[in-house]
Each structure stands twice: as structure tokens, then as C-alpha cells.
UniProtKB/Swiss-Prot annotation:
The lineage of its organism: Bacteria, Pseudomonadati, Pseudomonadota, Gammaproteobacteria, Lysobacterales. Its EC number is 6.1.1.5. Catalyzes the attachment of isoleucine to tRNA(Ile). As IleRS can inadvertently accommodate and process structurally similar amino acids such as valine, to avoid such errors it has two additional distinct tRNA(Ile)-dependent editing activities. One activity is designated as 'pretransfer' editing and involves the hydrolysis of activated Val-AMP. The other activity is designated 'posttransfer' editing and involves deacylation of mischarged Val-tRNA(Ile). It comes from Xylella fastidiosa (strain 9a5c). It is found in: Cytoplasm. The keyword Protein transport does not apply. ATP binds at K621. This is Isoleucine--tRNA ligase.
Length: 943
């Protein structure tokens, strides 16, 4: 080439870096956000808009954040930011859960239990200081994720005002009649020395002893008569039970049978040379006898369970204790014997049976529950068969009790069972049911259960199965144990009568008075309070209780202590947490909301799955498969983590591995490269001067704006239904297919070769400006750092941050009367695909090197040919090929053929044209390039 025409081309130019370099670039953006008080500015721009309130469920203030925290906070952040673009004011007030056992354990490890080196006041202060330190660490990590919120004024459950509002919330619940006191079996952790909530329990496999124990009948003939059988004089009669908790047998006070189950009187194994008949559920008889070494099922009679009611048995090792046969609807024929040993101090269903029969007051507290808070039998526990139980831990007692049963001849079978068993979420140790005096929010009193079930149906659940799940949980849950026997928490400020144990009749009003003091001085004031201040002359008749509130009550009343306190409306628009929160925060918030206001505190509930590795295994240190968010940020950047979260179906388990992160990085690169190409071609474009009206745009440019409009509608709808994976896929497809494989490829010719201010070039730049202005908004909720950076390179005057705007309004659909309609483009793009398929084998066989070397002939039916012939001169730009000819033919649809060109190649645009050499000044250029270099410039209408 004798002349260098490169300087006549308008190649892309931008300072927007090709490499994201996110680990270095993101902290600088964060610094600017901090310096500019970005959250305050965001709220100021949104002032006066409709409110969208996503209420933050508080993470626990203990330990560094993990991947699950990152998933949760980033999903919330994506929603908050998308709502701002959607025209809402979407405040975000982060919070922390600060009371409870994990912090107590951390302080105990350092200083010992309360009373060792610290008194209770000092201990609570150390807990408070520890929680504050943990909040600082977690806040730093959350902000590094790009989470925008009121980080300078978060809510903390340890704040005096919050603690006071929590007591006021409890007072409301007392006013509504939902609080009761009772001695009931509750989940108990010996290591905690306290009751546990349902949400503080996790199920882990455990090996337990499995025993069948015979309870002899005191009047065997009468019991046999129930089965229309006559008991021979030398035959014993017993009812076997099956249990995996032999340690509860000292508390066994009855046997429950199913009233409608069928029972049979069968021949059992001999005992001391004597025959023994057994009563078993018919459906379980053969299986039970097999455990006892009996192969033959010999039935002496049958009866319904109801017929055995109130017959009396003997305790297997306490001869002076009589055991009544009671009816229990919880008894099933699924396993065991069909008879359930009933210890009302160690089982909720057992307790309910005794309550129904009015038997609870017939026994002392030690008889109902002979086990202390540490898991040791009380000194009053009776011994048997040389076995002294008093002072023995129940787990050590299990094998000793089995041996003693064997010696007494009442052990029918013994084995071990590997099964799922409840454990303390913090200590990872087995827990038990243990009857203790506790305070409960009653599910039945004041009809809380039915009101909660109704409220659930007025909430929108994402995914939809969440509704059925929480309905089932509420239908079956027991009363909520809200009292804890610990130190670090909000006290239950009740005065109870010294003799009757009844709460003071003015309890709610007294609570509010205590709350006023707590707001000024903190929870310690309750313990130092002189009760004569509040009770006057009644003070001697009452005593303060020292229990604290369940931490799930703390977080469960945030709708009251945070939203109302900050002037925000209830119910919140959205609660968003992990799937385990159906039994945690969603449920505690629901119950307090219904108890106080007779309504759920949220309109929508969204749950996300847990993070697992590529094999579906839970991430853990022991497996060595954990990936920490801090490591991802350090090596790849927060936007890569955000993109992975957004692109994953969070309704199920969320898989992450290094390979998945690599694919996510590739996807990010595609998005960034697309943005960079768009910006590069906007070099020298000023929208205030050069923007082409939509009606004057080249047809292809107008069509891509139409496509962007369609995609924006799809993206907005997906953000509304929280389907972020669809958004990411839509954007990636747009980058690859609509832009990369089509629009950007086709328009390079116009952008590079036309005169700088040519209408055809300005039309393409206008389209790219519209695309970029929309594109940056589409990605902003997800790729917040990259969108911030991209926004700073967008030409023209605009707001300081993309999130100060709303969805881009410069897009519009093609009008029905457009010269080329959307339907026309669908057909043309189908034609383009056919052309590509025809050229592929020619390129593969070396017939042509590039599509520009091929001349295309399209034979089409008359109507199609007539429609396409006006486009003939420009179809070559759409196909990026040589000349195109359209001819009518007697055919349905169209037929594409191609042949190599014989024309010369233009040194500037690389097209093969017949007029090369016709211009003496530019003999190496085609006529189009000559007019673009030295003339008025070419005219383009379609492509």
C-alpha cells in the first residue's frame, strides 16, 4: 500500500482499562464512596419516592464472615440497588444479633464462668465489648463486598434502646395474653445449662442403646380378659416397650398405647423357666418377637388399644411404683412394640398425655424429672438392684441401667442404633428433653397458632414451597420457650408471687417502667433494681425472676425495635435469609408480629440455599473444601463473587469451586470487553451535540435499540421477581449474540471507515450510547464496582453515580410502520444465518479466506424478493460479504448460493470491489472509501 490510510480510520479509543484489576481498583472506589457518603447521597436522590423496605436479618456478632454471609448480604444488596433503579427509596439498615451463648462461651474461655474471676455485671460488660469488636470486623468485610447501607447507624440488639424496646414488645405480648408459665419438657443442653429454642438445634448421627423392656401386669388375668383370653396360672403377662433412652426409665410413670391400634396377646420368650405372654401391636408383633428370638407368631387374642386403658403394670425396677396404661394419639405402629414408655418430664408428647389425664399434680418435680441441669441424677433418685443413680450422669448411666434390667430378667432385647439425634448447635453435644419451669409464648392461648397460620397465607413466598414448609412447622410446633437460664441477654422483667408463683397482675405496666430504666442504664439495672421502687408495699410478696429472653426473641422483634423506632412502616416489603430461617428468624418474627399486631411483619419472604462444593458437599475445614469470601476478593475481586452469586440458582444449594470461579471470571471478562468496545467507539461522541433522533437512525441501529428495549423489559421483570440468574444469562447472551456476533461486528465498517461526523457513523454511535447507558444500569446492582467505573467513562452530563438514576428511558420499541419492522429483522437474521452456513464449508475447504471474498446470490419467492431487493446494495454489510444479488424465483422461501469474488481488495476497508483503481489519487481504494476520505462521505439507510 503506497499510502497509509490508517490515520483516516476511526478506530476505538478509550481509557477504560481492558483488565478489571478488581482487587486493586475496588478499594479505591470504596474509599470514594466512603468519602462522599454514598449511602446518604443515594437516600437524598430517592427522597419522596415510594418506599421499598428490605429488613435485614441480623447475623450473629461472632467470628469472621463466611461464604453464606456473603451470599445473603450480596443478594440483599442486589435487590436494594435494583429497587433504587426501579424508582423506589430503598433504605438498608444492617443489624447484628449480639446476645446469647456463643459470646458467653467466648468470654468463659478467657475469664471462666460467671463468679470465677468476673461477677455478672463485669461478665456482661465483657460480652458487650466482645460483641462490639466482632461487629467492627464484620462491618469492614461486609462493606468490602460493595454492600451499601447505613453502616454508621446499624441496629444492634445490645443497644440500650433496643433492649428497652424488646421489653416493651414483651409487654405488648403479655397484654395480649400470650405469655404463660409452666413446667414442661424443653430441649435442654447440659453444656449450656439452659433451654434451647428449636432453631438452636441441629441433627447429627449418634449411636444409642436400643432396648426392649417388659413391664409386668399387676393383674395379669384381668388384662388377659381384655383379649378374651384366659391366662394359665403358670404364665406371666407383660407389656414390652422399646426405647433408645434407657436413662429415662427412672422417670417412667406410665405406658401409652394407641387407642385405635390393633394389639395381640402373643406367646413370648420364657422367663426363669416360666412362659410369658406379651402384648404387642399386631403390625409390629412378628418383628418384635424376632428381636426376642421367637420365630413363630402364636396369638392368644386381640383387642383395640382403647380396651387396655387404666390397667396397671409394674415398673421394671421400682416395685412400689405402679404404671397405668394410658391412651396416646402419638403412638404409632411404625416401629417398636406399639407401647410407649411415658416419662412426662422427658418428652413433650408424654407430658401432653399426662396433662390430658390430669396426672401432673400427682407427682413431685423430682419424680417427673430426676435429672439436674448438668445431666446428673438428683440425690433423691431411688437406687435399684445395687445401682445407685444419684450423682451419676445420664450418659454413664445408660449401659449400667441396661445391665441392671438384664439382671432383673425384664430385658427382652438390647442392641445399638445409629440414628439422627438432636444436638446443641453451639457445643455439638447431644441434648435431651427435660421438664423445667419456663416461660412460654403459648401457641393456643389467645389463638396464636390459628392466627399465625392465617397470616402465612397473606405472605408471598420465594420459592413457593416455603409457604407449605412454614405452615407445617407452625401447625406442629410446641409452645415457644422464651426463657433462658443464662447471663448475657435481655432479662424477662417479671415479678412473681413468692408463694403462688403467679406473675404480678400489673406485669405489662411494670415491664414498661423497667424498660424506661433499661433505655437509660442498660439491662444491669434490672438485677440491681430495688423492687420497692415499683411495687411499694407489695414488694415483700414478690420476687424478681432472673431468666433472660431467648435470642430468637431478640431478633424476632426487630420489626418493632428497628422499623417502628426509625419511623419505617410495618410490614416490611421483604425478609431474605437462608432456608434454615423458616424455623428461625422468619418464624420468630411471624409469631411476635402476630402476637402483637395480628399480622405478619413482612409481605414477602425469600430464602436462599446453602453453599456447597462442586460435589454437593457442605464446605468445612475438616474436608478442606472451604472457600472464604475474603480469599476470592483478594485474588479476583468482589465483583467476581457478586457475579457468581447472581448467576447461581440460589433457591437450591449453591455450588462453588475454583473451576466455577474461573468460568465466572470468563463471564465477567465478556461483560467488561463488551463495555470497553462500546466505550471505545464512543470516542469523540458528545450526546448533547451528536445524538441522532431515533426516527433518523440507520435501520440496524434502530433495531438494536429496539432489542435493548425488549431486554430491559425482561431484565426489569426479572429483578422484580428476584431472578438474578436470568438477568446474568440475558446480559451474557446479549453480549455474545446480539452484540458480539452481530451488531458490533456489522457496525465496525461504518464506525471505522465513514467520516467522523457522517450521519451513518453518528447513528451507530447514538445506538452505542443508548446501549451503554442502559447496559451500565442493567449490571449496576450486580457488578457495582464495575458499573461505577463504567459510568465514569460514559460521555455527556449525568448524575454522579449510576444508582442516582432510574432505568434508562432512551430506549423504545420499533414502531409498527418502521421501514424495517422487528418481524423483518427476524427474517433477515434468519437469512444471515443461512448465508453463514453456506460460507462455512467454502472457508473450511479453502475456497475463500473470509466472507468478504464471497459473492452471494439469493433466490427468493416474488414477494420476499420484492421486499429484499431495495436492500441489495447494503445487504453485503449485514452479511459482511462481497456483493449480494437478490432474484425472484419459483420457490418457497429462499435459496442461498455463493461463489468466490474475482474483484480486487480495497486497501482501506478490505472489501472486494469492482471500482478499485478508478480513482487516480487513490488507486488502491474503492469508490466508497474515496468519498469517505476526500468527498462528502457515503450514505447508508439500512445497515
Amino acid at each position: 500500500m503506497s499510502q497509509d490510510y490508517k490515520t483516516t480510520l476511526h478506530l476505538p479509543a478509550t481509557d477504560f482499562p481492558m483488565r478489571g484489576d478488581l482487587p486493586k481498583r475496588e478499594p479505591a472506589i470504596l474509599e470514594r464512596w466512603e468519602r462522599d457518603d454514598f449511602y446518604a447521597q443515594l437516600r437524598a436522590h430517592a427522597k419522596g419516592r415510594p418506599l421499598f423496605l428490605l429488613h435485614d436479618g441480623p447475623p450473629y456478632a461472632n467470628g469472621q464472615i463466611h461464604l453464606g454471609h456473603a451470599v445473603n448480604k450480596i443478594l440483599k444488596d442486589i435487590i436494594i440497588k435494583s429497587k433504587h433503579l426501579d424508582g423506589f427509596d430503598a433504605p438498608y439498615i444492617p443489624g447484628w444479633d449480639c446476645h446469647g451463648l456463643p459470646i458467653e462461651i467466648a468470654i468463659e474461655k478467657k475469664y471462666g464462668k460467671v463468679g470465677v474471676t468476673l461477677d455478672a455485671v463485669q461478665f456482661r460488660q465483657k460480652c458487650r465489648e466482645y460483641a462490639a469488636e466482632q461487629i467492627q470486623l464484620q462491618r469492614r468485610d461486609f462493606k468490602r463486598l460493595g454492600i451499601i447501607g447505613d453502616w454508621d447507624a446499624p441496629y444492634k440488639t445490645l443497644d440500650f434502646r433496643f433492649e428497652a424496646d424488646e421489653i416493651r414488645a414483651l409487654a405488648k405480648i403479655v397484654d395480649k395474653g400470650h405469655l404463660i408459665r409452666g413446667t414442661k419438657p424443653v430441649h435442654w443442653c447440659f453444656d449450656c445449662g439452659s433451654a434451647l429454642a428449636e432453631a438452636e438445634i441441629e441433627y447429627t448421627d449418634k449411636t444409642s442403646p436400643m432396648v426392649d423392656v417388659a413391664y409386668p401386669a399387676l393383674d395379669p388375668s384381668a388384662l388377659a380378659a381384655v383379649f378374651n383370653a384366659t391366662l394359665p396360672p403358670d404364665v406371666q403377662l407383660a407389656v414390652p416397650i422399646w426405647t433408645t433412652t434407657p436413662w429415662t426409665l427412672p422417670a417412667s410413670l406410665a405406658i401409652s398405647v394407641g387407642p385405635t391400634l390393633d394389639y395381640v396377646l402373643v406367646e413370648g420368650p420364657t422367663h426363669s423357666g416360666q412362659r410369658r405372654w406379651l402384648i404387642l401391636a399386631e403390625a409390629l408383633a412378628a418383628k418384635a418377637l424376632a428381636r426376642y428370638g421367637i420365630a413363630e407368631l402364636l396369638i392368644h387374642g386381640s383387642a383395640k388399644g382403647a380396651a387396655m386403658e387404666q390397667h396397671i403394670l409394674a415398673h421394671p425396677f421400682y416395685p412400689d411404683r405402679t404404671i397405668p396404661l394410658l391412651l396416646g394419639n402419638h403412638v404409632s405402629a411404625e416401629d417398636g412394640t406399639g407401647a410407649v414408655h411415658t416419662a412426662p418430664g422427658h418428652g413433650q408428647e408424654d407430658h401432653q398425655v399426662f396433662q390430658q389425664y390430669g396426672l401432673l399434680n400427682h407427682y413431685s418435680a423430682a419424680e417427673l424429672n430426676p435429672v439436674d441441669a448438668r445431666g446428673v441424677y438428683l440425690p433423691t433418685t431411688p437406687p435399684f438392684s445395687e445401682l445407685t443413680l444419684a450423682g451419676l450422669h445420664i450418659w454413664k448411666a445408660n449401659p449400667l441401667i441396661v445391665d441392671a434390667l438384664r439382671l432383673r430378667g425384664v430385658l427382652l432385647a438390647a442392641a445399638e442404633m445409629h440414628h439422627s439425634y438432636p444436638h446443641c448447635w453451639r457445643h455439638k453435644t447431644p441434648i435431651v428433653f427435660r421438664a423445667t419451669p419456663q416461660w412460654f409464648i403459648s401457641m393456643e392461648q389467645a389463638a396464636l397458632r390459628s392466627a399465625a397460620l392465617k397470616a402465612i397465607t397473606h405472605v408471598t413466598w420465594y420459592p413457593q414451597w416455603g409457604q407449605a414448609r412454614i405452615l407445617s412447622m407452625i401447625e406442629n410446633r410446641p409452645d415457644w420457650t422464651i426463657s433462658r437460664q443464662r447471663t448475657w441477654g435481655v432479662p424477662i422483667p417479671l415479678f412473681v408471687h413468692r408463694h403462688s408463683g403467679a406473675p404480678h397482675p400489673r406485669s405489662a405496666a411494670l415491664m414498661r417502667q423497667v424498660a424506661d430504666r433499661v433505655e437509660q442504664q442498660g439491662v444491669d439495672i434490672w438485677y440491681s433494681l430495688d423492687q420497692t421502687e415499683l411495687l411499694g408495699t407489695e414488694a415483700d410478696q414478690y420476687e424478681k425472676i432472673t431468666d433472660i429472653l431467648d435470642v430468637w426473641f431478640d431478633s424476632g422483634i426487630t420489626h418493632e425495635a428497628v422499623l417502628l423506632e426509625r419511623g419505617l412502616p410495618k410490614p416490611a416489603d421483604l425478609y431474605l435469609e437462608g432456608a434454615d430461617q423458616h424455623r428461625g428468624w422468619f418464624q420468630s418474627s411471624l409469631l411476635t408480629g402476630v402476637a402483637m399486631d395480628n399480622a405478619a411483619p413482612y409481605k414477602q419472604c425469600l430464602t436462599h440455599g446453602f453453599t456447597v462444593d462442586q460435589h454437593g458437599r457442605k464446605m468445612s475445614k475438616s474436608l478442606g473444601n472451604g472457600i472464604e469470601p475474603q480469599d476470592i476478593i483478594k485474588t479476583l475481586g468482589a465483583d467476581i463473587l457478586r457475579l457468581w452469586i447472581a448467576s447461581t440458582d440460589y433457591s437450591n444449594e449453591m455450588s462453588l469451586s475454583q473451576e466455577i470461579l474461573k468460568r465466572t471470571t470468563d463471564a465477567y471478562r465478556r461483560i467488561r470487553n463488551t463495555a470497553r468496545f462500546l466505550l471505545g467507539n464512543l470516542h469523540g461522541f458528545d450526546p448533547t451535540l451528536h445524538l441522532v433522533p431515533l426516527s433518523d437512525m440507520i435501520a440496524l441501529d434502530r433495531w438494536i435499540v429496539h432489542r435493548a428495549f425488549e431486554l430491559q423489559q425482561t431484565i426489569k421483570a426479572a429483578y422484580t421477581r428476584y431472578d438474578f440468574a436470568e438477568i446474568v444469562q440475558t446480559i451474557l447472551n446479549f453480549c455474545s449474540v446480539d452484540l458480539g456476533s452481530l451488531y458490533l461486528d456489522v457496525t465496525k465498517d461504518r464506525l471505522y471507515t465513514m467520516r467522523e461526523d457522517a450521519p451513518g457513523r453518528r447513528s451507530a454511535q447514538t445506538a452505542m450510547y443508548h446501549l451503554t447507558a442502559a447496559f451500565v444500569r442493567w449490571i449496576a446492582p450486580i457488578l457495582s464496582f464495575t458499573a461505577d467505573e463504567l459510568w465514569s467513562y460514559l460521555p455527556g452530563d449525568h448524575a454522579d453515580n449510576v444508582l442516582f438514576t432510574t432505568w434508562y428511558d432512551g430506549l423504545a420499541p420499533l414502531p409498527p410502520n418502521a421501514p424495517l419492522t422487528a418481524a423483518d429483522f427476524d427474517k433477515l437474521l434468519t437469512l444471515r444465518d443461512h448465508v453463514t452456513k453456506v460460507l462455512e464449508p467454502m472457508r473450511a475447504n479453502g475456497v475463500i479466506g473470509a466472507a468478504l471474498e464471497a459473492e452471494i446470490t439469493i433466490a427468493a419467492d416474488a414477494d420476499t424478493a420484492a421486499r429484499w431487493q431495495p436492500l441489495t446494495e447494503e445487504l453485503r454489510f449485514l452479511f459482511i460479504s462481497g456483493d449480494v444479488t437478490v432474484t425472484p424465483a419459483n420457490t418457497d422461501g429462499f435459496f442461498v448460493s455463493a461463489q468466490p469474488t474475482t474483484k480486487a481488495k480495497c486497501a482501506r476497508c478490505w472489501h472486494y470491489r469492482a471500482d478499485i483503481g478508478a480513482h487516480p489519487t487513490h488507486p488502491e481504494l474503492c469508490g466508497r472509501c474515496v468519498t469517505n476520505v476526500d468527498g462528502p462521505g457515503e450514505q447508508r439507510h439500512w445497515f
